[in-house]
Amino acid sequence: MRSAQVYRWQIPMDAGVVLRDRRLKTRDGLYVCLREGEREGWGEISPLPGFSQETWEEAQSVLLAWVNNWLAGDCELPQMPSVAFGVSCALAELTDTLPQAANYRAAPLCNGDPDDLILKLADMPGEKVAKVKVGLYEAVRDGMVVNLLLEAIPDLHLRLDANRAWTPLKGQQFAKYVNPDYRDRIAFLEEPCKTRDDSRAFARETGIAIAWDESLREPDFAFVAEEGVRAVVIKPTLTGSLEKVREQVQAAHALGLTAVISSSIESSLGLTQLARIAAWLTPDTIPGLDTLDLMQAQQVRRWPGSTLPVVEVDALERLL
């Protein structure tokens, strides 16, 4: 016997969260809970404003229609990426095909303060990896901050994310302030320039490895080995079903590229599932999941070690 419930939720964000020039005051999303006999599976559907093609309202409409079809015996996945991802996670939990083992070693987001980062990294076992957002301020300032961090912490490897913010000139201004001796400790820089060709040129000219992120979701993207490209960053909420995520990871690994499972600012429930996906598909790579502290609460499932209050399922709005 099948049953299901869909929950709508909204979590207040910390004041300083800005995505593509818009301030994100709340994180809005949906959960789907599927039950079959004694088994239960959960999934999160939370399109990311400014990044997802679909809105939260569109996702809700598609999700509710899919749930009704599933209750009637139809299991075909929806095409909308955020809904496909959440539904496939719920189905995987329901059939016990999403392993329980999780990788909670999130690469910490750094605000540029070396002392703060040293404290965050002190308890991190193994490789010291952190992430810095660049492209929000002047490129020269970004270069100086990155150089300072690499100089202050000799065993640090940095992941940088520019979100296509730079022109070729700004990319060169950034690189000018990063000591060439430190550049190989930049694990990768995600999408430095507005076009892929400019990003490729940046990698060739600076020796700083790059990673594809937004490019993966463009219709003309193909997985090929390229000079200067070291990694792909896979955001499942923006990608689609678990099967599509797995296909992308396998395609990257076949080329010798690092594949990083990364957050789209999901709630704690979604983040714990991403940690499980990372342990399953990319066991040797630290995922990019250090986004929970951007929110003011956890929901339904706790992230280990987080002190944020937890909103239980009974407090969420039911849609069925």
From Swiss-Prot:
SMART domains linked to this entry: MR_MLE
Keyword match Metal-binding: yes
Keyword line: Lyase, Magnesium, Menaquinone biosynthesis, Metal-binding
Catalytic residues, chain numbering: K133 (proton donor), K235 (proton acceptor)
Binding residue positions for Mg(2+): D161, E190, D213
InterPro entries: Enolase-like_C_sf, Enolase-like_N, Enolase_C-like, Mandelate_racemase_C, OSB_synthase_MenC1, OSBS_N
UniProt enzyme class: lyase
Known pathway: Quinol/quinone metabolism; 1,4-dihydroxy-2-naphthoate biosynthesis; 1,4-dihydroxy-2-naphthoate from chorismate: step 4/7; Quinol/quinone metabolism; menaquinone biosynthesis
EC numbers: 4.2.1.113
Catalytic activity: (1R,6R)-6-hydroxy-2-succinyl-cyclohexa-2,4-diene-1-carboxylate = 2-succinylbenzoate + H2O
GO biological process: menaquinone biosynthetic process
UniProt xrefs under CDD domains: OSBS
Cofactor field: Mg(2+)
Any one GO MF annotation of this record: magnesium ion binding
Family assignment from sequence similarity: Belongs to the mandelate racemase/muconate lactonizing enzyme family. MenC type 1 subfamily.
Role summary: Converts 2-succinyl-6-hydroxy-2,4-cyclohexadiene-1-carboxylate (SHCHC) to 2-succinylbenzoate (OSB). Does not show detectable N-acylamino acid racemase (NAAAR) activity with N-acetyl-S-methionine as substrate.
PANTHER family: O-SUCCINYLBENZOATE SYNTHASE (PTHR48073:SF2), O-SUCCINYLBENZOATE SYNTHASE-RELATED (PTHR48073)
Name of the protein in its database record: o-succinylbenzoate synthase
Organism this protein belongs to: Escherichia coli (strain K12)
